Amino acid sequence: MRLPGRHVLYALSAVTMLAACSSNGARGGIASTNMNPTNPPATAETATVSPTPAPQSARTETWINLQVGDCLADLPPADLSRITVTIVDCATAHSAEVYLRAPVAVDAAVVSMANRDCAAGFAPYTGQSVDTSPYSVAYLIDSHQDRTGADLTPSTVICLLQPANGQLLTGSARR
């Protein structure tokens, strides 16, 4: 398959053995205050801001839980004999970066749809066209399909960017 002017290095697809996946949850946050102008508080309230987290160390995660902005030290093999990946801080050398998670139907056109969605999501994340960038595109497909085969959707395509020259990335490609 080809994305406009660029070969897709490879496409990994799979039907996972899990019926659903969970997100990694919230990251950081701000405690809100009551600032209703019609009922001002009796005493001054202040907003508390969580401290900036320290750089994230490497962690192992199942690939179906990858989130936009995750940088991967490694990728699962094409045969999916291993379903975990190592996520690292994007400032360190890494093999790929997740730039899009998008719903996709699992049917005969899944490869075409995944290519279309990954191509469309590239420029908004990187600020570059996939044709003129130093990156190649790959993807993983998590079908979320139940084991009866009765429900083929919703499914998720997880789009990854990698250096076209096969070298490692250092830093995020996010604009």
From Swiss-Prot:
A lipid is attached at C21 (S-diacylglycerol cysteine). GO terms for cellular component: plasma membrane. The keyword Manganese does not apply. Keywords: Cell membrane, Lipoprotein, Membrane, Palmitate, Signal. Residues 31-56 are annotated as: Disordered. Residues 1-20 form the signal peptide. It is found in: Cell membrane. Residues 33-48 have a biased composition (Low complexity). A lipid is attached at C21 (N-palmitoyl cysteine). It is a lipid-anchor. Its main location: membrane. This is Putative lipoprotein LppN. The gene is lppN.
